[in-house]
Regions:
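Short alpha-helical segments used as structural interaction elements across diverse proteins
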Residues: 14, 38, 69, 92-97
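Charged alpha-helical initiation segments
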Residues: 1-28
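Charge-enriched, short contiguous segments at helix-coil
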Residues: 78-148
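Short, hydrophobic, well-ordered secondary-structure elements
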Residues: 19, 24-47
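Generic recognition of short, well-ordered alpha-helical interface segments
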Residues: 13, 29-32, 59, 66
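Short, hydrophobic/aromatic alpha-helical segments in well-folded domains
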Residues: 14-17, 33, 116
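Amphipathic alpha-helical interaction surfaces
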Residues: 40-48, 70, 97-100, 104-107
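Flexible secondary-structure boundary motifs
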Residues: 42-88, 136, 140
Length: 148
């Protein structure tokens, strides 16, 4: 394994955990790992492209939405990749559905019921399935474009 062996092993473990999490109904774990993969690939691309570390003013990594905004600034006309007409928009749409799912298990407006567990699990399963496909495409895109 050339280059960063630890990164390779981390990714191998991440993909394995995504698979196992989905097989066992732990969709939030899969979604969290997918976000980590997508963020890492965006950070890697932007650091190579812009030549700087992507840290906020308080020396923390930028939020997922902030990363997407910076990524979009590199591709103002969109980003065709694989079967996605605009990969950046697709990632951002998934981010929104991910946020909804992450908070949906117990969060509700005061006085309103939370959604049913069955509906939550259905939405979480779908977000994990979609997130895996998107994370794979972001990885594929990153491999092709990081060297340019």
């Amino acid at each position: 394994i050339a280059g960063n062996a630890n990164k390779y092993y981390s990714y191998r473990e991440a993909w394995s955990r995504i698979r196992l999490a989905q097989e066992n109904g732990f969709y939030l774990e899969a979604i969290a790992i997918q976000e980590s993969i997508i963020s890492d690939r965006i950070i890697n691309y932007l650091c190579h492209k812009q030549g700087v570390a992507l840290l906020s003013n308080n020396n923390h990594f930028l939020s997922f939405s902030e990363l997407i905004i910076k990524w979009r600034s590199e591709f103002p006309n969109g980003l065709l990749s694989g079967s996605y007409s605009n990969l950046i928009d697709t990632v951002n749409e998934w981010r929104l559905s991910r946020n909804k799912v992450i908070h949906a298990i117990v969060k509700s407006k005061p006085g309103e019921q939370t959604q049913s567990i069955d509906l939550f699990l259905e939405q979480a399963k779908e977000a994990a399935k979609v997130g895996e496909a998107i994370a794979r495409e972001v990885c594929n895109w990153s491999k092709k474009n990081i060297r340019k």
